[in-house]
Amino acid sequence: IPHEGTTTFHDASFGDITVENKELEDQVLLKSDGLPTYNFANVVDDHLMGITHVVRGSEYLSSAPKYNLLYEAFGWEIPTYVHCSPVMRDAQHKMSKRHGDPSYEDLIREGYLTEAVLNYVALLGWSPKGEYAEREFYTLCELAEIFDISGISKSPAVFDINKLRWMNAEYMKKLSPEAFFSKAEPVLKSVITNPAIDLKAVAALVQPRCEILSDLPERVDFIDKLPVYSTDLYVHKKSKTTLENSLSSLQAALPVLEGLETWTNEALYDALVALAAKLEVKNSIILWPLRVAVSGKASTPGGATELCALLGKEESIARVKTGIELLQK
């Protein structure tokens, strides 16, 4: 091991790196039991396996000069080094399974799509160049075709779970209705036990608003059974609804719903919009109270008439009557 001067090696990400030879330790190659140490075995194994590119975390940059001394001692070609900066949980902490950060398997179990995870992770610490620089969505085949080492960043990347959720939602929207249903069906069946409910219709309703599959139970649990809810939900600033006009709206909507012969989203919407026009109120004055009455939730996977069409006439009317009773107390 040289003790004077410097040693320089090239890394594809960090460029030329120079270290003081006096900082290199005289490494042990064989342990007392005759077995090789990791650094020694690693170099020999990589050479015998024909490894041309060594890709690893930037924390191992300091080990490269020690490896190079072994390559040179054996007369072997030094591989191309590609040291990648770590993926961070935040500005100060690296991602770590010990601290509860998710693995790939965890993300898939939560309902993320493989395609979305691959796309997002590929762009952590790497960015495409040229005509591809402005794009965010890539297939695995496209990534393999356009990948170039020069796009790897020296700066650590932060894993943003909210960005991944957004990207996953975009991939969900792109699925065909059949493909989405095949993924959502097991989750929907675990929550919705009423055989009268058309699960394909539920899937079609939630797909445009689904970020990850594990969100679905909370989104659709009201379908099987109306949850206990506070009448505060009827008060909505944007819709300009109050407890008083919500009661009036439900009371006015009830006979319209009872008299409706065609129970579809379109027929329901037309009838209720006509009612709003007759009462000379905004559509939301009728539709928001109805939405709350049939779902018991502030956020739903669809609008009032979509939910009514899904629940069916009998169940929808029963829930409207329950809403009227709550508002009359």
What are these model-predicted stretches?
Residues 243-291:
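C-terminal accessory/binding modules appended to enzymatic or scaffolding proteins
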Residues 49-54, 102, 253, 271-273, ...:
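Glycine- and acidic
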Residues 234-235:
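Basic, amphipathic alpha-helix used for nucleic-acid engagement in HTH/winged-helix/SANT-Myb modules
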Residues 1-83, 88-95, 103, 261:
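Active-site cores that bind ATP or allylic diphosphates and position pyrophosphate for catalysis
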